[in-house]
């Protein structure tokens, strides 16, 4: 899509708020097709920003902007350092959209999950695994999609800027998965793999404005309960 097409869609919508979630989010795909990634992950949000005068624009970014950070985290908004094309494009998107629309909100989202999804996510991957699972000593947040939706009214009221957005954790992905299998009564096995770069975030900035999430383990338990899985 080009700028004129985006402008027409926005004008015809008569929307007061635009929430942009679309992306090419597969890191490997972005590495293989950087031009497509740039169009989807940078140019389209910029086109939206150009067409959003007088409207509140909310764009989903990614925790991948922290992939190259040298410290162990958890990471604050001012510590971004991408290490792949997807993360670099998301960071450029944030900067360019905010330059055009300073009141817009950039949400650095985590890996999201739900029991109903057309594509794999943490919850479904673990529930449907047929072989031994392997997770490294990596600290990262994963977020229940329902809590994302529940927070959107508060997100709309956020001052313009960049916000870490999702569940916080004090457990590694291996520890989380081990606990997840225990509470579901699964006989599936999980083994600890090699250490992987952390992606956990400090979400205190958003929390100061009332945008709060369950911790990672509590979010998983809530999701399992909501769908009658425990």
Each predicted region: which residue ranges?
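C-terminal amphipathic/interface module of NAD(P)-dependent oxidoreductases
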Residues: 186-188, 193-230
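Conserved Rossmann-fold NAD(P)-dependent oxidoreductase catalytic core, especially the SDR/UDP-sugar
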Residues: 46-83
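SDR active-site strand-loop-helix element
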Residues: 18-22, 57-63, 107-109
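NAD(P)H-binding glycine-rich loop region in Rossmannoid oxidoreductase-like domains
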Residues: 1-40
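Mid/C-terminal beta-alpha module of Rossmann-like enzyme folds, strongest
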Residues: 151-198, 202-203
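Glycine-rich NAD(P)-binding loop of the Rossmann-fold in SDR/ketoreductase-type enzymes
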Residues: 1, 32-44, 77-80, 88-91
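NAD(P)-dependent short-chain dehydrogenase/reductase
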Residues: 95-141, 145-147
């Amino acid at each position: 899509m080009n700028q004129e097409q985006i402008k027409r869609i926005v004008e015809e919508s008569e929307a007061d708020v635009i929430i942009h979630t679309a992306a090419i989010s597969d890191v490997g795909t972005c590495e293989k097709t950087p031009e497509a990634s740039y169009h989807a992950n940078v140019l389209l949000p910029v086109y939206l920003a150009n067409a959003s005068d007088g409207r509140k624009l909310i764009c989903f970014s990614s925790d991948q902007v922290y992939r190259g950070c040298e410290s162990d985290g958890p990471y604050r908004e001012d510590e971004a350092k991408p290490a792949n094309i997807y993360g670099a494009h998301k960071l450029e998107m944030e900067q360019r959209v905010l330059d055009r629309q300073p009141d817009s909100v950039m949400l650095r989202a985590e890996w999201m999950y739900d029991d109903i999804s057309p594509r794999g996510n943490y919850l479904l991957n673990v529930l449907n695994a047929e072989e031994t699972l392997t997770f490294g000593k990596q600290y990262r947040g994963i977020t229940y999609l329902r809590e994302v939706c529940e927070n959107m009214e508060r997100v709309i009221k956020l001052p313009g800027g960049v916000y870490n957005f999702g569940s916080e954790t004090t457990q590694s992905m291996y520890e989380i998965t081990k606990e997840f299998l225990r509470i579901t009564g699964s006989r599936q096995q999980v083994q600890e793999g090699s250490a992987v770069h952390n992606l956990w975030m400090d979400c205190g900035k958003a929390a100061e404005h009332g945008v709060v999430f369950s911790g990672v383990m509590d979010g998983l338990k809530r999701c399992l309960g909501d769908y009658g899985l425990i």
